[in-house]
């Protein structure tokens, strides 16, 4: 049986997941996920982050295991390349530049843009066909292709709505979240102290600005998806030695099992004493290291 990835408080702390925003920028709806404040910065409760990350990773695993499709979304500069890297690694879909309004709710228009992209690529790859165009026309086509690729490269093989949306920065990606809600697509999202966790089915309290934090999240998400893909392949009788060759096939699969929307998973309860001690000790160690560096 595949092993779903996990993360501990020390790993989250080392990646800076506990650092929220300035206390003046907080969203009161995040109060239950905040441990305290230090130097006018909110500290996120990593005990909850670890527990809720586990729930999110299991959701990703189960979605892919059932041949579901996941759409990763983050268009902020810090996350753009990382999102694409890990989505491609696990054979899933992504939007890492501008979210085009209607990407989910007006798929017919988006599909038309994808078809336009495919035609442009086909024309530009045909040397004989290009002989009928001027240099300026070819340059214009190349520019149009690159512009379309920025927005559509990660979803060009997505032929139906995703079964799960995974978001980093709910404030910036609020349009994507609203569209997912309209279509009853469940949402996994990293929520910082200035975020609104409403409409997020599987919130993960954490820093959504740090590159180290974002890379950790995406690595865990991709590993969970790959484990789900492995289980799906096994169930289909696929030779696991040839699993990599089947990743592209998973991208274009039309036989998707729709993931039933789960109820919102709110504040974790009954965190054990060992976890409390681990978190407090990790914070104290971090403070001591900071003080020794400043001495």
Curated annotation (Swiss-Prot):
Keywords: Ribonucleoprotein, Ribosomal protein. One of its GO terms (biological process) is translation. It holds the Pfam family Ribosomal_S2. It comes from the Bacteria. Transmembrane segments: none annotated. SUPFAM superfamilies: Ribosomal protein S2. InterPro entries: Ribosomal_uS2 (IPR001865), Ribosomal_uS2_bac/mit/plastid (IPR005706), Ribosomal_uS2_CS (IPR018130), Ribosomal_uS2_flav_dom_sf (IPR023591). The keyword Ribonucleoprotein applies. GO terms for cellular component: cytosolic small ribosomal subunit. GO terms for molecular function: structural constituent of ribosome. The keyword Zinc-finger does not apply. Residues 260-295 are annotated as: Disordered. Belongs to the universal ribosomal protein uS2 family. This is Small ribosomal subunit protein uS2. It comes from Rickettsia felis (strain ATCC VR-1525 / URRWXCal2) (Rickettsia azadi). The gene is rpsB.
